[in-house]
């Protein structure tokens, strides 16, 4: 779909957003698609960390992926962090400090990796917010994201 959009409207900017568990899918997807930026919002960046921190999701992960020790290859295929490289688009990490669904250490882990490989990134850590920001914080988040995407577009012109 992104390729079709880019073919029909080559000058259009495409910004991809991955929220929560969609964060890891987005990290895996944008490597193959011509996107101008990626926003990971309250997102999982490492499936191993998700397995460790979310005891309530272990059953689902074992059914869908397998056990991390017995099915290492299946987990490695879903390791989005390893797919990141210097050609990755700019990434904005948005995460709440009180997020109980996806711990903020997922964001810190991703930030460390992006810094290590030299990918352009920015962070918006809202230390008093949970998985979904409260209305006033949500409004500020959306303003920040809009400003960030606009800056990405200006820099690409």
Predicted regions, residues:
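C-terminal catalytic histidine-bearing segment of alpha/beta-hydrolase fold enzymes
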Residues: 108-157
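Conserved alpha/beta-hydrolase "acid-adjacent" motif
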Residues: 100-106
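Mobile cap/lid helix-loop segments that gate and shape the active-site cleft of serine hydrolases
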Residues: 48-83
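Hydrophobic anchor at the start of a short beta-strand
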Residues: 14, 91, 121-122
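Residue-level signal for short, function-critical loop segments
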Residues: 20, 97, 127
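Hydrophobic/aromatic beta-strand patches that form the interior of the parallel beta-sheet core
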Residues: 37-39, 92-94, 124
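Primarily recognizes the serine-hydrolase "nucleophile elbow" in alpha/beta-hydrolase
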Residues: 3-53
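Short beta-strand/loop motif that positions the catalytic acidic residue
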Residues: 87, 93-95, 99
């Amino acid at each position: 779909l992104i390729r079709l959009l880019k073919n029909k409207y080559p000058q259009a900017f495409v910004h991809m957003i991955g929220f929560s568990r969609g964060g890891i899918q987005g990290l895996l997807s944008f490597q193959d698609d011509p996107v101008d930026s990626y926003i990971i919002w309250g997102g999982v960046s490492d499936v191993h960390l998700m397995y460790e921190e979310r005891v309530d999701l272990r059953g689902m992960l074992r059914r869908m992926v397998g056990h991390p020790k017995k099915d290492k290859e299946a987990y490695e295929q879903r390791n989005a962090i390893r797919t990141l490289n210097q050609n990755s688009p700019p990434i904005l990490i948005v995460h709440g400090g009180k997020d109980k669904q996806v711990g903020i250490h997922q964001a810190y882990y991703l930030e460390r990796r992006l810094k290590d490989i030299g990918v352009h990134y920015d962070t918006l850590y809202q230390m008093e917010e949970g998985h979904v920001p409260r209305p006033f914080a949500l409004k500020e988040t959306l303003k920040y994201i809009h400003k960030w995407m606009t800056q990405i577009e200006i820099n690409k012109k």
